[in-house]
């Protein structure tokens, strides 16, 4: 079923089914080491929509607002950061990234649950996270923010299992901690440890070291 345009009337999404975030843990993965040598120590970045919507994230908002993308698991956060499913992930690509587990503060309002079947009545389908129409998904994000939502809970585009869940948090654009819910305590995650690699393998992503060519496709 195709994704429809979001409702135009203000307040149309006020009563959309919520998903509690307060007291849960989310994972954020970001590019810590940039190609030019710059190191981004902070995991927080709220991206505003660009002139080319396909250059940004599916739920980016128009400036001065922005969106930060997290997930419920490490594997989900890696796929969100990569924006692609790599069956053979170069180790250097993962090593260039940082990861933290964030404790969501008790003051964080619930997210609009995009996975709830009730959304179908408004034309909302899984294409809002699995599809490729960035302008349309960004319009849905703007409609949810218009109607008072501070976050979205949904699937992850490049998750081949269909089981991973992401959370997109809205705030002012730029590099800063979320401002509307108090401190977000962080714990560092080692993306190259065995536990992480097993979790990635479970969703079809296998790390490839330097010089290790990916397997040839089966004829």
Where are these regions (language model features)?
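Extended catalytic/binding region for NAD+/ADP-ribose chemistry, centered on the ART fold
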Residues: 56-88
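Active-site and NAD+-binding cores of ADP-ribose-processing enzymes
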Residues: 1-56, 84-219
């Amino acid at each position: 079923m195709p994704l429809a345009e979001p409702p135009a009337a203000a307040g149309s999404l006020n009563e959309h089914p919520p998903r509690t975030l307060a007291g849960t843990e989310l994972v954020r993965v970001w590019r810590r080491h940039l190609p030019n040598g710059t190191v981004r120590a902070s995991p927080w970045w709220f991206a505003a929509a660009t002139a080319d919507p396909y250059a940004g994230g599916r739920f980016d908002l128009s400036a001065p607002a922005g969106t930060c993308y997290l997930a419920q698991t490490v594997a989900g956060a890696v796929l969100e950061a990569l924006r692609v499913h790599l069956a053979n992930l170069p180790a250097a690509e993962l090593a260039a990234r940082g990861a933290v587990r964030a404790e969501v503060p008790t003051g964080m309002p619930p997210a609009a649950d995009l996975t709830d079947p009730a959304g179908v009545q408004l034309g909302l389908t899984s294409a809002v996270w699995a599809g490729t129409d960035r302008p349309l998904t960004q319009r849905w994000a703007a409609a949810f923010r218009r109607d008072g939502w501070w976050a979205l809970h949904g699937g992850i585009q490049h998750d081949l299992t269909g089981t991973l869940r992401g959370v997109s948090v809205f705030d002012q654009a730029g590099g800063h901690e979320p401002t509307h819910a108090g401190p977000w305590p962080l714990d560092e995650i080692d993306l190259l440890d065995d536990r992480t690699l097993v979790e990635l393998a479970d969703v079809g992503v296998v790390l490839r070291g330097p010089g290790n060519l990916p397997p040839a496709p089966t004829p």
